[in-house]
């Protein structure tokens, strides 16, 4: 399989504020936050398209990278906002642009470095062990406001996460925006509740949070004893070959109250060459 990505716009909307890249040894997803600021879709595209080819390994290097790219974006958007003036310009000056970021780089010696800022998520699934690892914290934390990269304001070190996955020929590395990430982690928890109590606890916390994702988590109990790879991952991965089929599948999940309404983006890293 080659590296590839696809993105589905929120049902009923025109603008997709997600962005992604998928290269041989790097994938990334960014979710532009349209609830605050302006130019969110451009900022998310700008972030993924300006990622370095070599991995970011710690907060200081992440901060240095953002510090080295934000000004060009800011100046270009400022000039455009000035043409409109008024509320748009004031909003840009006051709030700027916001986005999350999740990225992964393939390393030598069967390693993969990942970083995240916000609630976009990098995953590593081992097809032989049937195990899923990811860059996020707990399922119920999707209910919290995410950390966001702003085009003009300082970063918060607490928002940055990084780590390394051990990978093999059986590993699949992929990244998604938050609504899809919640669905994936939620259903993995449900299919593994009898294997380890930690999955039952994680899913139960989301149910009892009485937040926007709790109804989805309740529905996830229908996945108990199901084959996670078959009923969840394969359907998502096959959608990378046929966007229309993926859109129909995601709309069905949304109608069944298993998936939040959002832009949906997935990027997958190709097999080792």
Predicted regions and their residues:
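N-terminal entry segment of metal-dependent catalytic domains or homologous docking segments
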Residues: 1-55, 120, 153-164, 260-267
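Acidic loop->beta-strand submotif enriched in PP2C/PPM serine/threonine phosphatases
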Residues: 13-22, 94-109, 113, 138-186
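Short helix/loop capping segments that flank catalytic or ligand/cofactor-binding pockets
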Residues: 37-38, 124-125, 183-185
